[in-house]
Design a protein with these regions (language model features):
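Intrinsically disordered, low-complexity segments enriched in serine/threonine/proline/glycine
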Residues: 8-11, 20, 26
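Nucleotide and nucleotide-moiety/phosphate-recognizing core
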Residues: 38-149, 159, 163-170, 179-185, ...
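Short, Lys/Arg-enriched N-terminal segments with co-localized hydrophobic residues
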Residues: 25-42
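Hydrophobic alpha-helical segments within soluble ligand-binding/sensing domains
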Residues: 154-157
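Active-site-adjacent mobile loop/cap segments within catalytic or ligand-binding domains
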Residues: 188-202, 212
Length: 231
C-alpha cells in the first residue's frame, strides 16, 4: 500500500515527489523526480528549412521540406501540426533512436525561434542532437556538402538559427544552382519550381545520399566539413 506523504518540493525546475509505501515488513520511501515544463529525452531533431504553403511545396527553397517528406513517407510516418511549437512534426526511428522531423510553420528567414523552442523543450544539445537540412544556392544541383558548424554563408534561414542557437550544429547543404540562375535574380530563382527531371534526381539524392548521412549523424559519425558528395 502506498500513500502520498505531502512532501513535494521544487529544486530549480525539478520537482521531487516522495511516496511512502508500506509492506508487511517495512516502510520505504520512493522518490520520483520530474521536470516542470520540459521533457528530457534521448532523441535527435532533423530540422528542415523551407516555406509553409502549397505554393512553395516544390520550390528550390523547400529542398529541406521535400527531403523530410520523403523520409517520413519511407517510414510510414504521419505529419502532425503542433501549434505549441509552430511546426509540422513527424516521428521516425533511425538506428533504433527516436528522431523528430521538423518543418517549421514560419517563413524561411524566421525559423530560428522555432528551432530554439524545440531544443529548449526537449533539453537537447545542438552540437550533438540537431541536424539542419537546407538548400544551398552556392552549390550546383546534385551536390551535397556536410558542415559541422559555422557562419550562415549568406543563408538567411541559417542566420536566424545561428542568432538563436549559435553556430555549433550540423547541416546538410543541398545544392540547387543551375544555369537558369544566371538569368534570374536570387529571390526568383530560389522560389522557382524544380523541373520534373530535377525532382526525380532529388528523390534519388534523398534515398541514396541524404538518408545514409542522417544515419551517420544519429550514430555520431557524421563526417566533417570537407566531406562532399557529387551525383
Amino acid at each position: 500500500m502506498c500513500g502520498y506523504n505531502g512532501s513535494i518540493h521544487s529544486v530549480s525546475k525539478v520537482r521531487v515527489l516522495q511516496i511512502v509505501c508500506k509492506t508487511s515488513i517495512y516502510y520505504s520511501i520512493i522518490t520520483i523526480k520530474f521536470q516542470c515544463g520540459t521533457i528530457e529525452q534521448d532523441m535527435k531533431l532533423l530540422f528542415a528549412q523551407g516555406n509553409p504553403g502549397r505554393q512553395y511545396a516544390r520550390t528550390r527553397h523547400n529542398t529541406g521540406f521535400i527531403a523530410l517528406d520523403a523520409l517520413a513517407e519511407a517510414q510510414g510516418a504521419t505529419w502532425s501540426t503542433q501549434t505549441k511549437f509552430r511546426a509540422d512534426i513527424a516521428e521516425i526511428s533511425v538506428q533504433g533512436e527516436k528522431v523528430l522531423l521538423i518543418k517549421p510553420l514560419s517563413f524561411y528567414n524566421e525559423t530560428g525561434q522555432i528551432a530554439r523552442g524545440l531544443v529548449d523543450f526537449y533539453k537537447l544539445e545542438p552540437s550533438e542532437d540537431l541536424l539542419v537540412i537546407h538548400d544551398e544556392l552556392a552549390l550546383p544541383f546534385g551536390t551535397i556538402r556536410v558542415r559541422q558548424k559555422g557562419s550562415d554563408a549568406g543563408n538567411n534561414g541559417i542566420k536566424s538559427i545561428n542568432a538563436h542557437l549559435g553556430e555549433n550544429y550540423a547541416r546538410i547543404r543541398v545544392g540547387i544552382w543551375n544555369e537558369r540562375h544566371d538569368i534570374m535574380d536570387d529571390a526568383d530563382f530560389v522560389l522557382s519550381a524544380f523541373s520534373e527531371e530535377e525532382s526525380k534526381l532529388l528523390s534519388t539524392l534523398v534515398e541514396t545520399k541524404i538518408t545514409p548521412l542522417i544515419s551517420a549523424f544519429v550514430k555520431g559519425e557524421l563526417e566533417p566539413v570537407s566531406h562532399k558528395l557529387d551525383v
